[in-house]
A protein has these predicted regions:
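Binuclear metal-dependent hydrolase catalytic cores centered on His/Asp/Glu-rich metal-binding motifs
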Residues: 127-147, 173-212, 229-238
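Binuclear metal-dependent phosphoesterase catalytic core
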Residues: 14, 171-173, 236-244, 248-249, ...
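Beta-strand-turn-beta hairpins that frame and shape the catalytic cleft
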Residues: 35-44, 169-179, 208-212, 262-268, ...
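Short, conserved loop/helix-junction motifs that constitute active-site signature segments
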Residues: 60-62, 89-94, 206-207, 231, ...
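Active-site neighborhood of phospho(di)ester-bond hydrolases with catalytic His/Asp-centered motifs
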Residues: 46-48, 67-72, 96-103, 165-166, ...
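Active-site-proximal segments of metal-dependent phosphoesterases and phosphodiesterases across multiple
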Residues: 115-125, 187, 208-246
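Core catalytic region of metal-dependent phosphoesterases/phosphodiesterases
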Residues: 47, 52-172
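Acidic, histidine-bearing metal-coordination/catalytic regions of metal-dependent phosphoesterases
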Residues: 1-46, 50-57, 111, 290, ...
């Protein structure tokens, strides 16, 4: 199915005001399971937006078959942050650990690292590396750390304890999981693309047989409402998810205050942001069980 560009795509708040007239959004309050998943189901544990704050997490990460992190596992993508995250995720008990990048993983985005001296933003203005740093909030990181992160090549190779997805998929016991880091332009961070055609071109890469979709950005209308009352989600992502891909689950983060689960009656949307609006890692992981294809068992 061909997905078009919504005329209000540049204003997701206005777009959702129109779209919501024909949309169903049901909030779901899910409790953590107290028993193991049966043999015909895959238990998936979701987190996002931990921002190098995993040492301060006060909850236990539930056991499961698959662990998904939907991006922003660092503050700026520095090598030390990536190494520390890799060590942390390596200590989790899950057999399959899947990670995507978010807008904070500057060193993972080749448009920042190759070359460092030139970067083209969505408004087609070229900036030197210095002015890029001037545009980016540091979250307590030094400008030197930001510069070093942006200049670090092949940093993905340091994620040795998980599977890193970037416009790619992995199949776990017949369940197809696709991960993509892109999001509508946001403060000239990593993996930013303009709303509309540029975003849609990324979503067109997602296979139609995806069971679990992992993006960093939310779709418009689900887990994307900011504290200012503005919607930050992508209009074309919602349209793509609902009309072409139709996954069973859509996992994301990015908008901390959007944490939680919702459904449109067919697809379950999960904003798994661990950090809250104040960048405190207070939100517990979200867990779900997905039924395996007929005849497939974990054993």
């Amino acid at each position: 199915m061909k997905i078009g560009i919504h005329p209000l795509t540049a204003d997701p708040t206005a777009a959702w005001r129109e779209l919501s007239q024909h949309q169903k959004v049901v909030k779901i309050n899910a409790k953590l399971p107290t028993t193991q998943a049966p043999s015909d189901k895959l238990r998936v544990v979701c987190m996002s937006d931990t921002h190098s704050l995993t040492p301060f997490i006060k909850f236990d990460v539930p056991a499961g078959d698959v662990f998904i992190h939907a991006g922003d596992f660092t503050k700026c993508g520095s090598l030390q942050e990536v190494i520390e995250f890799n060590n942390w995720i390596g200590n989790l008990p899950h057999k399959h650990k899947i990670v995507i990048a978010g807008n904070h993983e500057l060193s993972f985005d080749r448009t920042f690292t190759h070359p460092f001296s030139v970067h083209t933003s969505g408004d087609h203005q070229k900036h030197t590396g210095t002015s890029i740093l001037d545009d980016i909030p540091t979250l307590g990181m030094s400008k030197d750390a930001l510069a070093e992160a942006i200049k670090t090549n092949n940093i993905k190779d340091y994620l040795t304890n998980c599977t890193y997805l970037e416009d790619s998929e992995i199949v776990v016991h017949g369940i197809k999981i696709y991960g993509t880091p892109w999001q509508p332009e946001f403060c000239k961070w990593a993996f930013n693309v303009p709303r509309g055609e540029a975003c849609l071109s990324k979503w067109e890469m997602i296979p139609t047989d995806t069971d679990i979709l992992v993006t960093h950005t939310p779709p418009v209308g689900h887990g994307d409402l900011c504290c200012t009352g503005v919607r930050a989600g992508c209009v074309e992502l919602l349209s793509t998810v609902q009309n072409r891909i139709k996954p069973k689950y859509h996992v994301f983060g990015h908008i901390h205050e959007g944490y939680g689960i919702s459904s449109d009656g067919k697809i379950i949307y999960i904003n798994a942001s661990t950090c809250d609006l104040n960048y405190l890692p207070n939100n517990p992981p979200i867990v779900f069980d997905i039924t395996l294809p007929p005849g497939v068992q974990k054993s």
